[in-house]
């Protein structure tokens, strides 16, 4: 099981959209994929619930147990729901804001290594289902928090999402430095940075090229994904309607373009993993 986290310390850069769309394309390619929504805002959860509703002509997906309840019961399986063939969701809800308090009570500051025990808790629960999935895609809030710490600790790979604006570049650089500190701090942690994913704020704008060039200098051009996600208005609609797909729901050529884009990105991700020997 490969666990991948999409992140940046700047909000609104497309983390959720790109993580969910990658998970969707992995599922379409036959990989059993679980999306873990570690953001209490639950944007990934809402997107996938609407996708389920669109594909099944229903208002939305009914969720029985929340992730917070499942984690406190040490049984995340009870909260996992199926979206479509090969695509599953560990949904977030407003009660997930209680997760830091839950960990503080479970591992009080008087315990040895209490900080690492707290951030390792999610990984230990996720490991219980490692034989059930090929990929786990984790979405996190754009903050330095126990949510991000937990996701990174559980990850094999991290993808930094970079929107072509200066604040996003600053956030990506800060997140890169955070990853280095985290890696050095916890010897048992084991992740790598799979790449930096560029997301264009607007198409054919000169500033985009400047930001991309600066990012290449900062992170290394070999770390930048070849696939660049261009601005597509259709992605905004998905937040409201769910992901349209010609095989499963009403769609048009705009949807076909979106899926081609993310299929190409997914193929590049898989090729990078093959080169590292993580998949066949």
Label each PLM-derived region with a short phrase.
Residues 1-280:
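P-loop NTP-binding core
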């Amino acid at each position: 099981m490969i666990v991948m986290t999409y992140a940046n310390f700047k909000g609104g850069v497309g983390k959720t959209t790109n993580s969910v769309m990658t998970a969707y394309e992995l599922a379409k390619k036959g990989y059993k994929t679980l999306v873990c929504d570690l953001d209490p805002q639950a944007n990934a959860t809402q997107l996938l619930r609407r996708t389920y509703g669109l594909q099944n002509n229903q208002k939305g997906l009914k969720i029985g147990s929340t992730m917070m309840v499942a984690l406190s019961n040490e049984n995340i399986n009870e909260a996992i729901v199926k979206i479509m063939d090969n695509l599953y969701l560990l949904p977030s809800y407003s009660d997930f804001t209680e997760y830091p308090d839950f960990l503080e009570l479970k591992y009080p500051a008087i315990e040895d290594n209490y900080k690492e025990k707290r951030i390792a808790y999610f990984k230990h629960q996720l490991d219980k289902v490692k034989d059930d999935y090929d990929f786990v895609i984790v979405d996190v809030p754009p903050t330095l928090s126990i949510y991000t710490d937990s996701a990174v600790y559980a990850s094999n790979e991290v993808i930094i999402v970079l929107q072509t604006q200066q604040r996003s570049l600053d956030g990506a650089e800060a997140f890169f430095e955070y990853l280095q500190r985290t890696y050095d701090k916890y010897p048992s942690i084991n992740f790598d940075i799979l790449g930096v994913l560029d997301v264009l704020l607007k198409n054919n704008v000169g500033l985009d090229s400047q930001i991309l060039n600066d990012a290449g200098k900062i992170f290394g051009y070999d770390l930048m994904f070849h696939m660049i996600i261009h601005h597509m208005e259709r992605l905004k609609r998905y937040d409201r309607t769910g992901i349209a797909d010609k095989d499963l729901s009403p769609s048009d050529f705009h949807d076909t373009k979106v899926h081609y884009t993310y299929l190409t990105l997914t193929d590049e991700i898989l090729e990078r993993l093959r080169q590292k020997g993580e998949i066949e």
